[in-house]
Amino acid sequence: MLDFEKPLFEIRNKIDSLKESQEKNEVDLQDEIDMLEASLKRETTKVYTNLKPWDRVQIARLPERPTTLDYIPYIFDSFIELHGDRSFRDDPAMIGGIGYLDGKSVTVIGQQRGKDTKDNIYRNFGMAHPEGYRKALRLMKQAEKFNRPIFTFIDTKGAYPGKAAEERGQSESIAKNLMEMASLTVPVIAVVIGEGGSGGALGIGISNRVLMLENSTYSVISPEGAAALLWKDSNLAQIAAETMKITAHDLLDLGIIDEVINEPLGGAQKDEEAQALSIKKMFLKHLNELKQLTPEELANDRFEKFRKIGSVVE
């Protein structure tokens, strides 16, 4: 239960208590139950239509929030995962492969979090090593060779900052991805489905279109990290989240992203299939627009999109 959900939790408890009493004591409490359920529906709508940035950060971090591998079966047909960077090893924190979207062959890449402690250790909590980014780039260049559109799912706190990752060239691998992605001659569409953290997110995020689920975040640093750097107090993370403009609607207003994808009431985890189908609909919409561009126009469109971010007109 998240902090802002406490009022809803209390109403649910009352409903459960009345249902239990009704069943145990064989008394008719249905009118009271119906009133509380109507109240719960109203309050749920009120809460989730007035979320603060910090509330959305909490939703984006929910362990039960759908991951890349949860969405893929609903969006792509006949997906086959491909492994390895051909230099060191495979990285389970970065998955990728080929499949079909609406009958067309495509390449799919995404960061992958775990579902439980064991899985998170295997997936390194969704924080990719250099080999993960090199695998992603290998699949992107393969997609370019065979003229396949590329779809990426961004869902990471950031690239793994460990000693071994740095020794194997973490910064170089991300920098190379940024450079190579900028000049790809096929459509590239990215969607932020959870946390989009720093260079770890950008390493697969240089795309013609950047989409975000409405309760996802996209930032250069976590709110806790920003608060610690700016005010020497990570407890001020809520204020940092407000200041940083890391939510989907803020970033749309700033021109950083191209479209916000609505989530089911309560978050994507409430209806995984419906959320996946919403993502698929947006993928098809933007792909159809990008198909009108030549290979050179696609590369120029992507380059200019990111080149103008942060520009100031006096």
UniProtKB/Swiss-Prot annotation:
One GO term (biological process): malonyl-CoA biosynthetic process
InterPro entries named among the record's database cross-references: Acetyl_CoA_COase_a_su (IPR001095), ClpP/crotonase-like_dom_sf (IPR029045), COA_CT_C (IPR011763)
Catalytic activity: N(6)-carboxybiotinyl-L-lysyl-[protein] + acetyl-CoA = N(6)-biotinyl-L-lysyl-[protein] + malonyl-CoA
Pathway(s) it belongs to: Lipid metabolism; malonyl-CoA biosynthesis; malonyl-CoA from acetyl-CoA: step 1/1
The keyword GTP-binding appears for this protein: no
A GO molecular function held by the record: acetyl-CoA carboxylase activity
Group of enzyme by EC: transferase
Keywords: ATP-binding, Cytoplasm, Fatty acid biosynthesis, Fatty acid metabolism, Lipid biosynthesis, Lipid metabolism, Nucleotide-binding, Transferase
Subunit structure: Acetyl-CoA carboxylase is a heterohexamer composed of biotin carboxyl carrier protein (AccB), biotin carboxylase (AccC) and two subunits each of ACCase subunit alpha (AccA) and ACCase subunit beta (AccD).
Record PANTHER family: ACETYL-COENZYME A CARBOXYLASE CARBOXYL TRANSFERASE SUBUNIT ALPHA, ACETYL-COENZYME A CARBOXYLASE CARBOXYL TRANSFERASE SUBUNIT ALPHA, CHLOROPLASTIC
Protein name: Acetyl-coenzyme A carboxylase carboxyl transferase subunit alpha
Species of provenance: Staphylococcus epidermidis (strain ATCC 35984 / DSM 28319 / BCRC 17069 / CCUG 31568 / BM 3577 / RP62A)
